[in-house]
Structures are given as C-alpha cells and as structure tokens.
A protein has these predicted regions:
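Post-cleavage N-terminal segment of exported redox proteins
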Residues: 1-35, 135-142
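Aromatic- and Gly/Pro-enriched helix-to-coil junctions and flexible linker segments
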Residues: 27-142
C-alpha cells in the first residue's frame, strides 16, 4: 500500500505527464513552418492605431508570451520562434478559430470577439487579411 506522500507524488507525476502529452499533441497538430512564415510575422507588424503585438506580449505577465522583439525588428531566430510557437499553441483550439483565444481575444466584439483585450481590438472584422491568415492556420490543424 502507498503512503499518502507517495500517492501525492504519483498523482502529481501522472498529472504532469498528461499535461506534457496534451501540449505535445497540440503542438504536433499545428504546423510550425506555416506558423513561422505566415502567422508569426503578424505579431511584429505595425497596425494603424495599435502597438505591435510583441510590444505588449513580450512581458512576463501575459498568457500569450512572445520572445523579446528582435533588435532590428525583422524576425526571430528559429529557437525563439519555437518558444513563441509553444506559447501561441496554448491559445489555439485546432480546427476551430472562433474557439481559439489567439483569434477571439484581439477581435472586436461586433465581429465575434471578446471584450477583454487591453491592447484594443487588432482586428475589427473576420475579413481582415491577418485575422484570416491566422484563422486558416488554426483551421488547417488536424
């Protein structure tokens, strides 16, 4: 019979393994190369009337945490992109853009988004080209 302490450690280890497995499965469902070439550049892009996504989301207090902005503003290294991909993956429900916080949070409420984005609504419509690029990446996940 297991002691109370041993039982707690075993349950904790199983919970951690479950989280790691589901995180890995999620990342595998999403395509990294498409993310890096079509989605990630949007986070560096200046949108009229808004800060770049990276300006707010390189902070430690954000659930959507990006690596610090590249000094020349061009792009992240592959290692940084993989870290960004891992962070972004947690905000995506593969195959379902409107259930994905990554797309719903910065979308204006009138367009189907939520009301709680401190940086304002980056997208006023689901027809925005950048919103559609991210949505297509999410939709194509298996």
């Amino acid at each position: 019979m297991m002691s109370g302490g041993m039982r707690k450690k075993t349950i904790g280890a199983l919970a951690l393994a479950t989280v790691m497995t589901s995180s890995l499965a999620l990342a595998q469902a999403l395509d990294f190369e498409t993310y890096r070439t079509r989605v990630e550049p949007i986070f560096l892009k200046k949108r009229p009337g808004h800060a770049r996504c990276v300006v707010c989301h390189e902070a430690n207090n954000s659930a959507f945490r990006l690596q610090p902005k590249p000094p020349d503003g061009s792009t992240w290294t592959e290692e940084q992109s993989r870290k960004n991909f891992e962070s972004v993956s947690h905000l995506v429900k593969p195959g379902d853009p409107l259930s994905s916080k990554l797309l719903k949070h910065p979308l204006a409420p009138d367009a189907g988004g939520d009301e709680f984005h401190g940086g304002g609504w980056q997208f006023v419509s689901q027809k925005d080209a950048d919103w559609m690029a991210i949505a297509e990446w999410v939709r194509s996940a298996k």
